[in-house]
C-alpha cells in the first residue's frame, strides 16, 4: 500500500501534477489518498508527501520514528514551473526517498542533465561579502532550527569580518521562488565570496556560478560542500557537474510521472 497525504479538497493544487501520475503508475501496490491535515496512523506501508504543508512535518516525523519508507515531492532543482508559461514537459517536480531532498548518486550519465541549459562556471577566487540564503520557515522548523538565520549570522561574525548580505526567500502573488525576486540571485552572486544556506535550492545556482557554498548537514548540497561555518574564509569548491547529474535523475515532469518514466528511472536507480 502507498498512502499519499494530499489536500483532497484542493483539486487545483499542483500536487496533483505528481499524484495523478503516481496513482496510475506506482508498481505492485494499491494507492490510497488521505487528507494531510490528519494525524499519521501507524501502518506498514510507504507514504508520500507534497512539501511541508498542513500537518506533513509532524506526519513525516512519525513515519521516520516508526522506520517506514516515505517519498517526498516538491519543487525541482532546475526546470521550475512558470505560471505564465505552463506547457507539457516544460517543468519538473522532485521526488526523494526517506528525505526531503535528493540523495547523491554518483557517476550517472548526462542524458537528463542535457535537457537543461546549465552552464558551470569556473570557481571564483574573490568576493566582497557573504551571501546568506535562508530556507523557508517551514524547512527550519523541520530541521529543528527555527533560529537558524540569527544563529548563523552570530557564528559567521566569529570567523570573519567580511560584510554579510541576507537574501530572504522571494515571495509574492501567492507563490515563492525566482519569479518573485526583485533582484535575481545571479546578480547577488556576482560579488559574493560564498553562499551560506540551510537547505535552499540557491545552492544549485551558487555552485554553477562558481561560488562556494556552506550548507546545513541536512542539505542536498552536503555531499560536495562544507557544512561548518568555520570554513567561511576558505570554503571548499567541488566541480558540481556529477552532482547535477544526480539531481536531474530525481526530478520529473508531470507527463513523466504519468507515463511511467519516473517509476522506471527510480527502479533503475534502485530507489524503488
What are these model-derived regions, one by one?
Residues 9-11, 53-55, 76-79, 135-139, ...:
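Short, solvent-exposed loop/turn segments at secondary-structure junctions
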